[in-house]
Amino acid sequence: FGQKNIFKNLILGFVLGFVLQSLTILVIYLKGGYSIISINPISFIIPPLTMAIASSIIEEIIFRGILFRIIEEKLGTYISLIISALIFGLIHISNPNSSLMAGLGLSIQAGLLLGLAYVLTRNLWFPIMIHFAWNFTQSAIYGASVSGSKMSKTLITSEITGNELFTGGQFGPEGSIQATIFCLIATIVMLYLSRKKGRILKPYWKTTIANNGYN
């Protein structure tokens, strides 16, 4: 998980996840597709809060903490990012109301973004909190579907209508084009910072060649 800068990573992760999801919803709202039906008691956030905590921790341990690191050790950061992101996206195709495009979108939004969040910090708390904030904001606060599933109790009961390109349809806002664009921008920034900080690992064969050449 990493012991350094835990509080900083938690705060930054929450802010980033919240902002990315809020921008996604904002686009839907500006296009007239987001309507608030009712505002419910604060206790209504407990079910989606619990779900967001569980899914973010479990999925990040599996995909970034285990799968990504195993692949990265042999094949390097770039190949590991691509493989783990594709697996993450394809697994979500089995979700309700999902599709191949939704899965590919999640590969970019979550797979690459969260993978690079780990690479940048070498700390699981950062991607866990981004993941949590994204799901929590989308479901508990804005009352939207998350990866094809909609909670019955949320802080805001909302209705989302309009072009599925911008709403994500029944899959939820994370299936929208703007969600992919916003997350891709954040991914590019993290890639730049990761390269600048020297956090990118080479494939084992390049490391071996370099060491043999040096010796």
Mark where each language-model region is.
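Membrane-interface helix/loop boundary segments of multi-pass membrane proteins
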Residues: I58-I83, I87, L116-N123
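Functionally important transmembrane alpha-helices
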Residues: G103-E164
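C-terminal membrane module of polytopic membrane proteins
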Residues: T137-N215
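Juxtamembrane helix-loop-helix connectors linking adjacent transmembrane helices
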Residues: F1-I61, F68-E73, P203, A210-N215
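Structural signal for membrane-spanning alpha-helices in multi-pass inner-membrane proteins
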Residues: T24-Y29, F88-N95, L114, Y142, ...
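Alpha-helical transmembrane segments of multipass membrane proteins
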Residues: L16, L20-T24, S55, S84, ...
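Small-polar-interrupted transmembrane alpha-helices in polytopic inner-membrane proteins
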Residues: Q21-T24, M51-A52, S56, G76-I93, ...
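Hydrophobic alpha-helical transmembrane segments
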Residues: L10-V15, I45-I46, Y78-I83, L104-G105, ...
